[in-house]
């Protein structure tokens, strides 16, 4: 049980770090939007990749959490409360996967700054394709 709590604390710290990085990148994006449009396209590309990577990491940790939850539920005597936790974790994992797909398909690849940045950096397309294949 202590390992699950440590895992949850580690997960929260990691997500907080990712949110801080996203906020910093957003502030840089706003700064360069005002002063330098070429750098703005590169910052937007980095922002989009970091956003997608953070969803991938969240999905990965959610799947590990679902496995830990189902494993800890199987180690305890069967109770009415232990089964919904496992189902909740699996539903959360499914929700994160749907959200990642939505972000990939609708928000990021359709944005004009992301497409402009892709022209300057074709390796970005390869990285995002490998990450989210």
From Swiss-Prot:
CC per GO annotation: membrane
Keywords: Membrane, Transmembrane, Transmembrane helix
Protein name: Putative uncharacterized protein YJR023C
Other noteworthy facts: Partially overlaps LSM8.
Domain of life: Eukaryota
Membrane topology, record value: Multi-pass membrane protein
Localization per Swiss-Prot or TrEMBL: Membrane
Main location: membrane
Source organism: Saccharomyces cerevisiae (strain ATCC 204508 / S288c)
Transmembrane segments: 8-28, 46-66
């Amino acid at each position: 049980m202590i390992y699950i709590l440590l895992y949850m604390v580690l997960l929260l710290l990691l997500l907080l770090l990712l949110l801080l990085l996203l906020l910093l990148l957003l502030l840089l994006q706003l700064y360069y939007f005002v002063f330098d449009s070429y750098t703005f396209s590169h910052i937007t590309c980095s922002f989009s990749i970091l956003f997608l990577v953070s969803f991938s990491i969240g999905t990965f940790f959610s799947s590990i959490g679902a496995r830990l939850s189902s494993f800890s539920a199987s180690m305890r005597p069967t109770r009415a409360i232990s089964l919904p936790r496992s189902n909740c974790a699996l539903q959360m994992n499914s929700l994160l996967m749907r959200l990642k797909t939505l972000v990939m398909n609708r928000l990021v690849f359709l944005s004009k700054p992301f497409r402009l940045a892709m022209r300057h950096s074709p390796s970005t397309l390869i990285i995002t394709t490998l990450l989210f294949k």
